[in-house]
Amino acid sequence: MDIILMENVDGLGQIGDLVKVKPGYARNFLIPQKFAVEANTRNIKELEHQKRQLEHKAQKVLQASEVVKAQIEKVTCEFALRAGDDGKLFGSVTSMEIQAKLAESGVEVDRKKIQLDEPIKALGEYEVAVKLPAGILATVKVAVTALD
């Protein structure tokens, strides 16, 4: 029996896959548990339509992410903070502060998407990764200088 998977099923396939299984397995387990639907012409056409819509939506998200990436990479976040003689900061620069600087520049990013393993605690220039939708990774330049 041919079925269309509605959920990821270990050993069978991913969502949207058209697979052949034994009729009893489909009727007694997969279909009642809403893991699959029978692969008739109506369901196949509906699946193809949904795939086209998802591809279109994914393309829009990709284009929007590319625009945001270009905006992020133009920005340099500059921080002037008090520092000791050895170049260590009194305090630190966190993802929340980087998000605030990006927002000042007109780029809205969720602070959880800023890939900063630990806060910046020393003077210097850093490149910080920002994870965007559609798997796009942008880098923002962060410059930390001493406050006179």
Curated annotation (Swiss-Prot):
Lineage: superkingdom: Bacteria
Keyword Nuclease: no
Keyword RNA-binding: yes
Disulfide bonds: none
Keywords: Ribonucleoprotein, Ribosomal protein, RNA-binding, rRNA-binding
GO cellular component entries: ribonucleoprotein complex; ribosome
SUPFAM superfamilies: L9 N-domain-like, Ribosomal protein L9 C-domain
GO MF annotation terms: rRNA binding; structural constituent of ribosome
Role of this protein: Binds to the 23S rRNA.
UniProt cross-references to PANTHER family, sorted A to Z: 50S RIBOSOMAL PROTEIN L9 (PTHR21368)
Assigned protein family: Belongs to the bacterial ribosomal protein bL9 family.
NCBIfam families xref list: L9
Name the UniProt record assigns to this protein: Large ribosomal subunit protein bL9
Source species: Syntrophotalea carbinolica (strain DSM 2380 / NBRC 103641 / GraBd1)
Gene: rplI
